[in-house]
C-alpha cells in the first residue's frame, strides 16, 4: 500500500534540506509566548478573509474511498485497522498544524518564507499518531496539509502585493491631481498677462495704426502754410469709410488754440518725453495718445518738407526736383563749361 504513494513521500522529503537553520525540537518543546507588544503583524488582517476558503484541504474522500473498500480484504490480525480511526487522526494533526501556524504567524513577521512552513509540516508529522502498517493515508494527509499551507502563504503574499499596488495607485493618482492643479493655476496666472498684452497691442494698433497716419498727413499737406486753418475741415471727415468697408477711427478735431500750442511745442522740440507729453495733454485737455499721434504726423510732414520742398526757394516747382547727376570722368571740360553757362542763363 505504501508503494502506491511515492510522489507524496518524495514531496514531503524534499523541503527538509532548506529548514536546517532552525531546530524543530526547540520550536516544539517550548512554543514562544507572544508578548502583547509583538503582536503587530501587518499582513494578518489581510490574511483573515482567506482562512475559511484555503484552510480546509482538498476533499480527502477520493483517496480514502478505495482504502475503505480495501479494508475488509486485509487480514483480521490487525483489529485497529478500523475506518473511524482515520478521520480522528487526520483532524488531530490538522488542529495541531493550525495552532502552530497561528503562533508562528504571531511571532514571525517574515512568516512568508519557506522554512517555517516546512517546519510546521514536520512538527505536524511529529505530533500525529503513529502511522499504521498500511500508513499511506497519513502520508497523503500530510502532503495535502503542506499543499494547503503553501496555498495560504501564496495567497497572503498575493494580498500584500495587491495592497501595495493599490497604495501605489492611490499615491500616483494624488500626485497626478496635484500636478494637474498646479498646471491649472499656472494657466490661470498666465491668462491675465496674455489678455493684458493683447489688449495693449490692440490699443496701440487702434490709435497708431498706419490707416490713421496717411489721412491726417494728407489733410495737412493740402495747406502746408496754414496749419491753424485746418480745424473747420477736420470735423467733416468724421466717420468716413474706406473702399474695403473698414470703419476708420474718427479724426480728432483740434481747436485753433490747441493747434497753436502744439505748433509752438513742435517748433521748440521735435521729440517729446513722456512727462512733457503728459503735461501738454493735461494743459490742452487732450489725451496723451492724441498728442503723440499729432507729433508723429507733424514730424513726418516736417521731414517731407525738409527733403523735397526745399527746392521751392529757387522758384522751381516742387514736383520737379532737381536731380544732381555725377559727371563721368571722360566728359570733356567744354561740355561741363557749356552746362554751367546754361545754368547761369536760366537763373534770373
Swiss-Prot record:
Tissue-by-tissue expression: Expressed in adult brain, spleen and female genital tract. No expression in heart, liver, lung, kidney, or testis.
One Pfam family, short name: Homeodomain
Chain spans, region Disordered: 59-81, 111-139, 179-251
SUPFAM superfamilies reported in the protein's UniProt record: Homeodomain-like
Chief subcellular location: nucleus
GO terms under cellular component: nucleoplasm; nucleus
One of the GO BP terms on file: forebrain neuron development
Domain of life assignment: Eukaryota
GO molecular function, one term: RNA polymerase II core promoter sequence-specific DNA binding
Disulfide bonds: none
DNA-binding interval(s): 247-306
InterPro entries, per the entry: GBX-1/2 (IPR042982), HD (IPR001356), HD_metazoa (IPR020479), Homeobox_CS (IPR017970), Homeodomain-like_sf (IPR009057)
Keywords assigned: DNA-binding, Homeobox, Nucleus, Transcription, Transcription regulation
Subcellular localization(s) per the UniProt record: Nucleus
Basic and acidic residues bias spans: 181-198, 218-229
Function statement: May act as a transcription factor for cell pluripotency and differentiation in the embryo.
Name of this protein: Homeobox protein GBX-2
Species assigned in the record: Mus musculus (Mouse)
Lineage: Eukaryota, Metazoa, Chordata, Craniata, Vertebrata
